[in-house]
């Protein structure tokens, strides 16, 4: 039509069509495609790309790359949910759970009929007499036919009991004399006792014996009477004459019985010469000058230890002095320690004993006692033992102390902040069968006495003391008849004025608690083994209809259990 009119045609322009987008839509579409496929970081192939940000939906958002937590941290959060809210990790590790541990089980021969009989006492052979303070005589005996704790082993009496089939019939027991006394087994050789286990002497150099009761928490008191020692009479050199020497104090399981109490870092002692306190073989003045300890004096010893729950917090590195109190009586705590006793019955002459690997000295405390000038270990560091020390063996127990009385008069508090004794502060001797980190229930501070060349002493674990300490009041409504000093007479009983762990009690009460604990632990072990056997009793010796079932153990095939041989 334009050509017919003779007018020139207008410049060509693209026209819109339904199938072809407008010129402005083409670059927009391409821009959208470029945004979809443009990398977020420019590369050398397209350095000038500038993507236009646009809103993205939840599905289009790229996944955030978070650092993966370690397995140890995830397990820690699973066990302790409170850590998930921490801004920074807890620098103090958690106390490991010991609930998975059970006592080791051994293959044993069947018990003999004599094993079901009560434990036999030691044999007493008369040795000599010692003049008593009242003008009489004290008969001393040499004990025999019993085992001695040595070579890193600890022995306790046991008996076969048909009520404990899953434990292969053996459980703990006590031999005469019953009650708290100086232990015949836990003593050095060449010591002489009376038949009650309360008097002790020797004709050799320093020897030590521990009592048969361990103090683990609370306040306890006991007494030592010097029956043979330093006298007031002067010799030719102006020094007091001596019939021998006596030391007394508290000792842990690791303390050597072939040395006096206070010899190493595992015991705290007092010597009769000058009334000095002794720790790590370093005597220091304590009693007033010229005071000393003489024949006839009664030395009272009081010890206080915090609750076991607080002690475990100290050993786990979780102790906070601003929150944790040393006299926590544990009344609201429902958790109890898992006592694991790895022990095997052995025969010694006519006796049956449980043999256990005893706790052994540690390098850290030996370095503390004898620091090396060239050593860079913890003993030479500027950090003294304290509850939060980096080395568990050098951690101390808050609010712990030892007080000393002389003839009923408080002389002072020579020792505070006693070293911790629960694992991992105490470790067994490294050998086959020893497992670290376990508490066998025998750790603690034991009353201990050392004698030297004729020195003699008598112990009194209560409840009827020669000089009752403050805090004990006479209870007129509770009189009992007891034998004291060889005479039968009504004996006074004492009630204690303070509640909780700060109540002072005689060591004799702790002995009763220890017996109850041993019975409970025996029952727990029996139930534990019974559950391991599928909640049924298995005849391991092939004597019954279930002899074909052996569970986790098989009959040993031996005719006799292990026989122990020791030199007398």
Curated annotation (Swiss-Prot):
It comes from the Eukaryota. Residues 68-77, 89-98 have a biased composition (Basic and acidic residues). Disruption phenotype: Impairs tri- and dimethylation of H3K4. Impairs mycelial growth, sporulation and spore germination. Impairs fungal virulence but not infection-related morphogenesis. Leads to increased production of several secondary metabolites, including colletochlorins, higginsianins and sclerosporide. GO terms for cellular component: chromosome, telomeric region; Lid2 complex; Set1C/COMPASS complex. Keywords: Chromosome, Nucleus, Telomere. CDD domains: SPRY_Ash2. PROSITE patterns: B302_SPRY. InterPro entries: ASH2, B30.2/SPRY, B30.2/SPRY_sf, ConA-like_dom_sf, SPRY_dom. One of its GO terms (molecular function) is transcription cis-regulatory region binding. It is found in: Nucleus; Chromosome, Telomere. One of its GO terms (biological process) is negative regulation of gene expression, epigenetic. Residues 160-353 form the B30.2/SPRY domain. Residues 1-113 are annotated as: Disordered. Component of the COMPASS complex. Component of the COMPASS (Set1C) complex that specifically mono-, di- and trimethylates histone H3 to form H3K4me1/2/3, which subsequently plays a role in telomere length maintenance and transcription elongation regulation. Controls the production of several secondary metabolites, including colletochlorins, higginsianins and sclerosporide. Plays a key role in mycelial growth, sporulation, spore germination and virulence. Belongs to the cclA family. This is COMPASS component cclA. The gene is cclA.
């Amino acid at each position: 039509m334009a050509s017919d009119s003779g007018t020139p045609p207008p410049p060509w322009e693209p026209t819109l069509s339904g199938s072809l987008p407008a010129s402005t839509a083409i670059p927009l579409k391409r821009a959208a495609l470029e945004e979809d496929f443009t990398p977020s970081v420019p590369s050398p192939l397209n350095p000038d790309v500038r993507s236009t940000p646009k809103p993205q939906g939840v599905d289009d958002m790229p996944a955030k790359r978070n650092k993966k937590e370690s397995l140890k941290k995830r397990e820690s959060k699973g066990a302790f949910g409170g850590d998930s809210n921490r801004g920074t990790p807890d620098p103090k590790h958690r106390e490991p759970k010991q609930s998975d541990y059970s006592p080791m089980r051994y293959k044993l021969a069947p018990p003999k009929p004599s094993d079901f009989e009560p434990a036999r006492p030691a044999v007493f052979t008369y040795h000599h007499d010692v003049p008593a303070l009242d003008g009489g005589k004290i008969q001393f005996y040499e004990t025999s036919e019993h085992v001695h704790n040595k070579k890193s082993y600890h022995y306790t009496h046991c008996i076969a009991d048909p009520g404990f089939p899953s434990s292969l019939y053996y459980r703990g027991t006590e031999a005469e004399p019953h009650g708290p006394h100086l232990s015949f087994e836990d003593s050095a050789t060449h010591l002489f006792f009376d038949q009650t286990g309360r008097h002790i002497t020797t004709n050799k150099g320093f020897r030590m014996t521990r009592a048969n009761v361990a103090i683990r928490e609370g306040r306890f008191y006991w007494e030592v009477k010097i029956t043979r020692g330093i006298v007031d009479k002067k010799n030719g050199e102006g020094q007091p004459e001596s019939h021998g020497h006596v030391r007394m104090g508290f000792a842990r399981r690791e303390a050597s019985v072939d040395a006096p109490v206070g010899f190493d870092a595992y015991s705290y002692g007092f010597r009769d010469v000058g009334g000095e306190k002794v720790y790590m073989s370093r005597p220091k003045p304590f009693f007033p000058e010229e005071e000393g300890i003489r024949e006839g004096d009664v030395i009272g010893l009081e010890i206080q230890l915090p609750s076991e729950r607080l002690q475990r917090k100290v050993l786990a590195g979780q102790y906070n002095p601003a929150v944790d109190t040393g006299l926590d009586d544990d009344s609201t705590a429902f958790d109890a320690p898992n006592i694991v006793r790895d022990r095997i019955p052995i025969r010694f002459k006519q006796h049956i004993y449980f043999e256990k690997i005893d706790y052994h000295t540690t390098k850290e405390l030996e370095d503390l006692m004898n620091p090396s000038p060239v050593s860079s270990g913890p003993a030479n560091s500027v950090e003294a033992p304290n509850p939060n020390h980096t080395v568990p063996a050098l951690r101390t127990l808050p609010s712990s102390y030892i007080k000393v009385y002389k003839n009923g008069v408080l002389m002072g508090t020579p020792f505070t902040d006693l070293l911790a004794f629960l694992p991992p502060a105490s470790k067994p001797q490294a050998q086959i069968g020893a497992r670290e980190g376990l508490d066998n229930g025998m750790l603690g501070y034991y009353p201990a006495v050392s004698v030297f060349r004729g020195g003699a002493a008598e112990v009194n674990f209560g409840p009827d003391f020669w000089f009752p300490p403050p805090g004990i009041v006479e209870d007129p409504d509770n009189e009992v008849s007891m034998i004291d000093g060889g005479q039968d007479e009504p004996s006074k009983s004492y009630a204690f004025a303070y509640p909780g762990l700060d109540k002072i009690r005689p060591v004799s009460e702790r002995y009763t608690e220890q017996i109850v604990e041993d019975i409970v632990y025996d029952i727990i072990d029996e139930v534990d083994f019974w559950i391991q056997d599928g909640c049924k009793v298995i005849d391991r010796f092939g004597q019954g209809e279930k002899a074909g079932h052996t569970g986790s153990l098989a009959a040993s095939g031996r005719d006799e259990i292990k026989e122990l041989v020791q030199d007398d």
